[in-house]
């Protein structure tokens, strides 16, 4: 279909085009408790055309674009008619001119991921988790997907590759007398070792047990907070948002390369690197669907912004030599062990009901689903209440743990220590 569509669009006098073909093969399994309820297999192909129309206005070169999906069942006449309609749509919304990627050639031999075998391994990992008297698996859904991409454009890009990912969604119930709670656990990865998948669910079992015994969070001023949450990945995405070419071009971020976001700060300096590949990541794509190659690059080094990243259009607007995707990222570990962080009183947040990070204002926080409070003598599980912080203030005094953890496409410090936090809670 992709070659046929390319031949047809060449007949329509467009200035540039890009075609993306994505075939997705998916194995899905749905379990009630540990019993298989349904197994589904799907195989779908989507072909999307992006076309670009240029014109000059008041001495400025402009470019409009439009996109739509096409199907094998469509006739040539129908496709040509829709392409002409797309050209008209593109001409109605013109933006400053930008170039599309050019001259990338990449043809990767299609890998056989043996999806059914991968699914069986994933099932085994979860069935290794045995119910206890108080903690039980309610249900779970598993997805194992292969994606085959073929991308061509009018500037000589012709790349093809395939990749895969796995996803597990598990609901766990925990009962303590008449009190029952439910926890939702969702993870995404690729080829993660079986024991690590099992250990992740067992960890949620332990947290579920503690949640049923949790006391209300007390109101605190100037608390030391340890963030040991799966939301730590989103915490560090703040730095990606601040350096995103689209955010910068549209003036939603004022960040400039060379700015020091931790000038005169105490504690650890943040270093964040983009990685083309990361073991067990579901985002190991050699190219974006724009036809831009992935690469390794440092975005922040010791608190100083080093580079922007982003899509082709906004990178071109900023005058960057090339667009850089953020498939995977790594935040380097800090100077303190978690044990050192726990020597003095703290509130360690394990789960938020919903973690929110506003990269424009730097505000972040959320309602506490499960945390552990250490008063200097004993540790008590707590729930409820919330924290509200600001990144600019938090970066003035912050420590990152020596220990790291991988959360799908990122490796980040397992615990982040921040200070002077106002905790809303029970009086």
What are the functions of these language-model segments?
Residues 1-277, 302, 414-427:
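Active-site bordering "gate/hinge" segments
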Residues 259-427:
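Dual-mode signal for accessory low-complexity, basic/Gly-rich regions
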């Amino acid at each position: 279909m992709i070659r046929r569509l390319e031949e047809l669009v060449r007949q329509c006098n467009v200035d540039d085009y890009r075609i993306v073909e994505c075939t997705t093969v998916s194995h899905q399994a749905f379990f009630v408790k540990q019993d298989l309820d349904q197994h589904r297999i799907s195989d779908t192909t989507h072909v999307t055309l992006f076309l670009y129309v240029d014109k000059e206005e008041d001495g400025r070169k402009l470019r409009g674009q439009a996109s739509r999906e096409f199907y094998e069942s469509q006739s040539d006449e129908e496709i040509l008619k829709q392409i002409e309609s797309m050209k008209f749509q593109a001409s109605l919304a013109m933006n400053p001119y930008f170039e599309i990627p050019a001259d990338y050639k990449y043809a990767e031999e299609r890998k056989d991921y043996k999806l059914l075998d991968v699914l069986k391994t994933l099932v085994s990992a979860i069935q290794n988790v045995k119910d206890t008297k108080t903690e039980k698996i309610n249900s779970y859904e598993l997805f194992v997907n292969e994606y085959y991409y073929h991308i061509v454009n009018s500037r000589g890009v012709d790349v093809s590759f395939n990749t895969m990912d796995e996803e597990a969604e598990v609901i766990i119930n925990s009962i303590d007398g008449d009190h029952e709670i439910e926890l939702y656990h969702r993870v995404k990865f690729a080829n993660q070792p079986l024991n690590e998948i099992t250990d992740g669910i067992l960890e949620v079992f332990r947290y579920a047990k503690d949640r049923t015994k949790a006391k209300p969070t007390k109101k605190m001023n100037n608390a030391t907070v340890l963030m040991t949450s799966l939301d730590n990945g989103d915490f560090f995405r703040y730095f990606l948002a601040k350096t995103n070419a689209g955010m910068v071009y549209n003036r939603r971020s004022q960040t400039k390369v060379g700015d020091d976001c931790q000038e005169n700060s105490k504690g650890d300096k943040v270093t964040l690197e983009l990685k083309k590949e990361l073991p067990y990541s579901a985002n190991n794509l050699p190219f974006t669907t724009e036809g831009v190659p992935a690469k390794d690059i440092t975005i922040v080094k010791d608190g100083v912004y080093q580079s922007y990243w982003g899509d082709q259009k906004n990178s071109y607007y900023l005058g960057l030599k090339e667009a850089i995707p953020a498939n995977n990222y790594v935040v380097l570990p800090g100077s303190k062990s978690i044990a050192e962080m726990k020597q003095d009183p703290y509130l360690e947040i394990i789960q938020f009901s919903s973690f929110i990070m506003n990269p424009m204002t730097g505000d972040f926080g959320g309602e506490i689903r499960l945390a552990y409070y250490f008063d200097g003598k004993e540790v008590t599980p707590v729930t409820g209440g919330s924290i509200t912080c600001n990144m600019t203030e938090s970066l003035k005094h912050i420590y990152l743990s020596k220990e790291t953890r991988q959360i799908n496409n990122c490796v980040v410090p397992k615990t982040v220590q921040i200070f002077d936090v106002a905790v809303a809670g029970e009086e």
